[in-house]
Design a protein with these regions (language model features):
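Short beta-strand scaffold segments in enzyme catalytic cores
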Residues: 49-57
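Short beta->alpha transition motifs characteristic of CBS
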Residues: 60-67
Length: 175
């Protein structure tokens, strides 16, 4: 296998290099980017969940949880990434886009994913308490809705889980 450097646009005017084999950006590569964004949230004392939206090998939207800093229960990583992506392309319909998020989306975010017409969802760790894409509920797999054609969990799920567990361990230690 050949390894080569691939430059991808992560935001307008911002590029990053991804080392990959055979020139393909893997789901794990994209999830690593979402994990990096989640880490930024952790540094800002937010629950470390990060999300990116990819269209034609470019990140067109990203976000991390900001519920605490914005005093907004809807400021989840997925919601902020969807808003950013919609603003980037000038359309609320995110057809042919993939969402990478470090934790299984909740019911609110699953509804937004369906409503925004996102084609593929890849998430890190499962959420047995609030997950709505296979754990507690399966909104994204419900044939009643026009759901994403691909829903895949456990993409670097262990890394996502460790990040979240580390955050809550440190929070409890402060108390």
């Amino acid at each position: 296998l050949r390894t080569r450097r691939l430059w991808v646009q992560v935001l307008p005017g911002v590029h990053m290099s991804i080392e990959n084999q055979l020139g393909a950006v893997s789901h794990e590569d994209w999830m690593r980017r979402a994990l990096s964004i989640a880490s930024k949230g952790m540094r800002e004392d937010e629950v470390p969940i990060g999300a990116i939206i990819v269209y034609k090998n470019k990140i067109i939207g990203q976000g991390y949880n900001q519920c605490e800093s914005l005093n907004d229960s809807t400021a989840h990583a997925e919601m902020l990434a969807i808003t950013a992506a919609s603003n980037t392309i000038g359309d609320w319909r995110l057809t042919d886009c993939s969402l990478y998020v470090t934790k299984e989306p909740c019911s609110m975010c699953a509804g937004a994913i369906i409503n925004s017409r996102i084609d593929a969802l890849y998430f890190g760790c499962y959420d047995e308490d609030f997950g709505a894409c296979g754990s507690k509920l399966d909104i994204c797999g419900n044939p009643t809705f026009k759901t994403p054609s691909v829903v895949r969990g456990n993409v670097l799920g262990g890394d996502s889980l460790v990040l979240i567990q580390d955050y809550f361990f440190k929070k409890r230690k402060k108390i």
